């Protein structure tokens, strides 16, 4: 017998059309078979002859796609609570980084932590996201900055998928920072690119990422890494225009990047390049909030150019120690001016697009049955309220 689940008496936010808001259906039902959505429609139109599927009465609750956190750094050693204090005492993110703190301090902790311990800590972070209805987590490397540790991080990311009911997509972020005392060009050519090649050989890389910024790598250096990614047929994405504008967005767009993330300093010409490339703008309000930034992303230009907007936690130990995608949705509205529809699209349909995935992020026949049922009356509540988890049930691969 096929594995079937029939959900009845439910409101469904399909999130399947950019011009149709939530795509809301009320008094609806949904049939899952073998891990995929088989049918959805009105309760009065439930197909006959279903036999005896497992049934779930949603009691009028809201069903959405399972949420997708499309930008995280949840595999790492240590924490940076002391740097939090330093920032409050007046030190800037760049000053901390140039003094050997920031990303480099996490690199040291991650190198010193064995694979088993990294996994146990990362599982706790994954559990927090899963508890809020997340069904897919993107996880980056980038706290190794050597071949051995970059591969260790990516192996841990892959292991999370085996240990928990969640999908994991990996990004190789070897170009995250310049190791202390190293030359950036030497590092890209002799460490980062060989690490990418080794990780790719092990099947550990779904995308290649980098940090293009004055305190990290310039466009020429990133271009060499992206060129190797292209040769290996690996899609790219980029942290760009977070603290300044040095041309990272246009570079990433020239490689048809899946997504370009942060983008607070992206201007109209950058956004036009993103639109032409089909790249998604991933907004990361947790970092904006934590770093006390003032330059907001040019949301109106993203809208006018029809650039898809995604929202993510950027969960990392330094600039965004935030383990709540629901809070990121709220912040994207209150800090950046997104609408609740845009925030939910940004953590479902557009988040899937930012990862190059077409089998999830919407509620439609043929898509994966990764779903969330919420104790809310209307979809806007998911962005409106914070500090409260309204998740009733999460469905992963068609299973409760």
Which positions does each model-derived feature cover?
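Active-site-adjacent C-terminal substructures of enzyme catalytic domains
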Residues: 235, 245-362, 374-376, 380, ...
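Metal-coordinating catalytic core of metallo-dependent amide/deamination hydrolases
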Residues: 106-121, 127, 135-246
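Metal-associated gating/positioning segment near the N- to mid-region
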Residues: 58-121
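Residue-level recognition of short, solvent-exposed, well-ordered loop/turn junctions
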Residues: 51, 364-367
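Generic structural signal for hydrophobic
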Residues: 129, 199, 225, 229, ...
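Conserved beta-strand scaffold positions in the cores of enzyme catalytic domains, especially
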Residues: 6, 53-57, 394
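N-terminal metal-binding scaffold of metallo-dependent hydrolase/deaminase domains
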Residues: 1-49
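Divalent metal-coordination and catalytic microenvironments
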Residues: 10, 30, 35, 60, ...
